[in-house]
Amino acid sequence: RICYNHLGTKPPTTECTQEDSCYKNIWRNITFDNIRRGCGCFTPRGDMPGPYCCESDKCNL
């Protein structure tokens, strides 16, 4: 599975292992007018909260 990332600070594509899943996170600043979306690999053993499937953002491909 390949997850496509939309954040410039991470690789554009990330290989996920079989037990990993894709997640989507949304960052907003204090005035809620700066929204950045990112996709990546999530493993249940990690500490990333709230994994979300984001097929519209080309995750879970």
Swiss-Prot record:
Gene3D superfamilies: CD59. One of its GO terms (molecular function) is toxin activity. One of its GO terms (cellular component) is extracellular region. Keywords: Cell adhesion impairing toxin, Disulfide bond, Hemostasis impairing toxin, Platelet aggregation inhibiting toxin, Secreted, Toxin. Its main location: secreted. Belongs to the three-finger toxin family. Short-chain subfamily. Antiplatelet toxin sub-subfamily. This is Toxin S5C1. It comes from Dendroaspis jamesoni kaimosae.
